[in-house]
Amino acid sequence: MKTEKDIRYSDISPLDKLDIYFANEEKGVIIYFHGGGFEAGDKYDPHVVEIAESFANFGYTFVNVDYSLYPNTKFPSFLIEAALAVKYIKERFPHQKIYITGTSAGAYISMMLCFNRELLGKHGIKPLDISGWIFESGQPTSHFNLLKFEKGLDPLLQRIDELAPLYYVDKNVLLSKALFILYTDDMPNRYEQNQLMIKAVKNFNPSLQLDQILLEGTHCAGSSIKDNDGLYPYVKKTIEWLER
């Protein structure tokens, strides 16, 4: 499998590098943002690498993106960085479908890119230019660690402000399609938060394709625990959704 590692896509943070896992087919390019609560995680995580290789084996070129983390970042730096990563990939693969996904904190980033239209809009990219969005157990309300680091608040609080993807949902919401992957034993409130997001979007635009899958297990188990067939449920369910 051909790969390109540690491609610098931005000069904002020393962590702003990405890896590309090239597929032999051209089914599309998947841009992935890892989880870790904005304090941890990177593209070298063994699970993340295996996920990248799995998607490439299914015909999707896969992009693992690193971004700045606390305590060496401030909101919205990692969102600006993420938008630059998308810009780089759009320019690198101008004729392929682009999909954006993420796990936990990475799903939060993906949601922000989708619903805060200014982030990608600065680079001439609209949410509709992305062929699909996959959010694995993201937090659509204000992220708990952003409440902690940015506002000094109790991370258990529920807030909808400029730190929340939900804050940007309005009558102009428009996207190709989205998949929400959630878990039966997810983080407290995570299922309910995502139901609120889905219903808020549908309230403005009932015709949008917003699908959801509820998997067995704890928070993001589908991208950290393989099934008996050796594949991650997150990968399998995403592939099924993309190709149906």
Residue ranges, per PLM feature:
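A fold-wide structural signal in alpha/beta-hydrolase
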Residues: 29, 56-66
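N-terminal cap/lid segment of alpha/beta-hydrolase-fold proteins
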Residues: 1-25
